[in-house]
């Protein structure tokens, strides 16, 4: 009975997941005086990461040779890579230190132009896109729950635009797996106690 319940929950979670084609953002200018971020991306449709429709995502670009337009509307896919930047067709994997810098911006730094410039330059440096090294390239912070928002001018995977950062929740499949193992462990424990 428990196996069927767990299987039903797993199947329902897969079927209920939003399709990437419905993820869209509109880009607004934020703090910072570089040719990069901070940008503010307004979620227009389905949730993106921890953000719901109407929320603004404070974010930074990863590539110096990809572009976006303030006021532009873009389709979004989530990945662990900057698509057009770096080696091979799979793109450039997001560096863990870049994740730490982004989380430090979201959780610790005061959001102003000076700090935004430091974050953008540190991210570009970390990703091999130029920029300049500063104290942020050696901070210790969490690298968890950060993904790349790949922006597209047309439907997903059509018309490369910029790659930005976004915080995401713990993946649902991992959470369900942990819950499933917990239930299985409790059942096994009950059997061995008898």
Task: Locate predicted features.
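Short alpha-helical segments used as structural interaction elements across diverse proteins
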Residues: 1, 117, 184-188
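Short, surface-exposed polybasic-aromatic patches that bind anionic ligands, especially phosphate groups
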Residues: 22-167
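A short, hydrophobic C-terminal helix/tail in secreted or cell-surface proteins
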Residues: 169-187
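Short, charged juxtamembrane terminal tails flanking transmembrane helices
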Residues: 190-194
């Amino acid at each position: 009975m428990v196996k069927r319940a767990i299987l039903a929950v797993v199947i329902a979670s897969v079927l209920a997941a939003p399709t990437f084609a419905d993820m869209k953002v509109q880009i607004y200018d934020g703090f910072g005086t570089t040719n990069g971020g901070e940008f503010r991306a307004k979620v227009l449709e389905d949730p993106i990461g921890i953000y719901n429709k109407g929320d603004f995502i404070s974010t930074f670009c990863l590539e110096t040779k990809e572009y976006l337009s303030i006021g532009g509307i873009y389709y979004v896919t989530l990945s662990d890579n900057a698509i057009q930047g770096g080696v091979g067709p799979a793109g450039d994997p997001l560096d863990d230190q870049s994740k730490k810098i982004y989380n430090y911006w979201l959780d610790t730094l005061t959001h102003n132009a000076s700090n935004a410039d430091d974050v953008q330059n540190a991210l570009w440096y970390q990703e091999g896109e130029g920029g300049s090294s500063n104290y942020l390239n050696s901070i210790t912070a969490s690298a968890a729950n950060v993904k790349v928002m790949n922006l597209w001018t047309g439907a997903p995977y059509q018309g490369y635009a910029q790659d930005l950062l976004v915080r995401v929740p713990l993946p649902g499949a991992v959470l369900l797996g942990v819950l499933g193992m917990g239930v299985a462990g409790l059942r096994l424990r009950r059997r061995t106690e008898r």
